[in-house]
Amino acid sequence: MARESESGLPIEPVYGPQALRGWDPAEKLGEPGEFPYTRGVYPSMYTGRPWTMRQYAGFGTAAESNARYRQLIAHGTTGLSVAFDLPTQMGHDSDAPIAHGEVGKVGVAIDSVEDMRVLFGGIPLDRVSTSMTINAPAAPLLLLYQLVAEEQGVGADRLTGTIQNDVLKEYIARGTYIFPPKPSLRLIADTFRYCRAEIPRWNTISISGYHMAEAGASPAQEIAFTLADGIEYVRTAVAAGMDVDDFAPRLSFFFVARTTILEEVAKFRAARRIWARVMREEFGARNPKSLMLRFHTQTAGVQLTAQQPEVNLVRVAVQGLAAVLGGTQSLHTNSFDEAIALPTDRSARLALRTQQVLAYETDVTATVDPFAGSYVVERMTDDLEAAAVALMDRVEDLGGAVEAIEQGFQKGEIERNAYRIAQETDSGERVVVGVNRFRLDEEEPYEPLRVDPAIEARQAERLAELRAERDRPAVDAALAALKKAAEGDDNVLHPMKEALRARATVGEVCNALREVWGAYVPSDAF
């Protein structure tokens, strides 16, 4: 009897040659590093060097997060990933009334160039690749990073990293949007153009399925809705007059890795194949780098449990293995205590050690795409591709990703799947170790990391000092220039950078744009 995958597709008890009858390896696979990139985007993949170990971190003040980053670097991390607090993600300063109670809680508070300078103090920005998980205010945070690099004497052409900058998934699954979709897409196109000219090695967007998966999307939904968003971004940039090969090589993606190894490996392989064909056939991309779906992976936080949290170490190791077998370019392995609170120093170190064991104590880096030709994985890859393309066609029938978002299509599909998962967990049909099976009579005590509530007052004091010391007329003039650019067609990042250089805050920059573009209010808001 066939078992159902997370995407509702059959997994047979036994597979043989009949599962791949008529299957053409030249068409479906190709060679690693060659179209359609099913086997990976680079010919040697991990046989030359392992993936980038990019641990996501940030909490409290810039000084506290800086200490964590330097600790991670000392422990062997090969890339940084910045977590910002909710006020920063929403474009509010730490002393804004709406920010009360949230400053520094789920990430680091960054209000101005002063904070960004402290955040990367003692970290040479030409020697580290930095990912910033920031969306609606991605442009000002990137510009703050560039300003700090200039202070270090590092040219923008030497900076490497990624901004998430994917606002469409915020409307679908997460909610940290600021502006309506149309001006949000304009800001993203401006960022593409700015980075091509100013920061050419920077990945301008990380088109994200991770958050959809955490909200309940199946693997097929995750890649379908992510790639549909990617198509919308490409269309936006092309409509703004950019050649596809001028920006597409800097596009990147972000996916989840669950414990269901076979389906996850198939998911990553199917996503690469679909994207390569879309870019070549729909957009006429000629540069091979424009066809490559390069992606970062984070292990599935939604699968971690507060009960028996040490079991999460096992879950994360399995999830990380799935990401590696699927050909990820970089990986964050969650800390075992993240279902309870922000990671402690110890749990963050163990999370990094998990990746290091995978890279250096197993043989998964010895050969490229070890599942190639597997009856089950190739069958599942084809099935997932077909399911994802069918969902992408439904998005297209609704008028594309933005129109489908406005109609609530993606959100509704994800919510239905999330409800199914919850029902299966509640009934015991879906086994969760330590939650509905193999429970302890009494949970062992665990002391989590606690963020100092006094951080909010300290950030407010820093802001007060900043506002008292800076040249207020220069700030006002720079913000006025930003608004003028937003009202017209000029690239807003140039006046935005000058405003931030004059020590305007992130909140002031975002408020200036709110005055011109307005704020998004979802149609299903209560």
What would you call each of these model-derived segments?
Residues N66, L142-L143, A220, V265-R269, ...:
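Conserved strand-to-helix beginnings and helix N-cap segments that scaffold or border functional pockets
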Residues R49, D95-I98, L168-E170, S206-G209, ...:
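Short acidic (Asp/Glu) and glycine-rich catalytic loops that position anionic groups and cofactors
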Residues D111, S129, I134-P137, A149-E151, ...:
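Phosphate/diphosphate-binding loops
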Residues D243-F247, A285-T299, Q307-N334, P343-V368, ...:
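Flexible glycine/proline-rich, aromatic-decorated loop/lid segments
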Residues G101-K105, K169-F179, M212-A217, F255-T260, ...:
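Short beta-alpha connecting loops at secondary-structure transitions
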Residues R3-G22, E31-Y37, L86, T344-D345, ...:
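Flexible, glycine-rich loop/tail regions that form catalytic "lids" or insertion modules at the edges
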Residues M1-R258, E263-E264, E282, K289-H296, ...:
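Catalytic alpha/beta active-site cores
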Residues F59, R68-H75, V113-I123, L144-V148, ...:
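Generic, well-ordered alpha-helical scaffold segments in large soluble proteins
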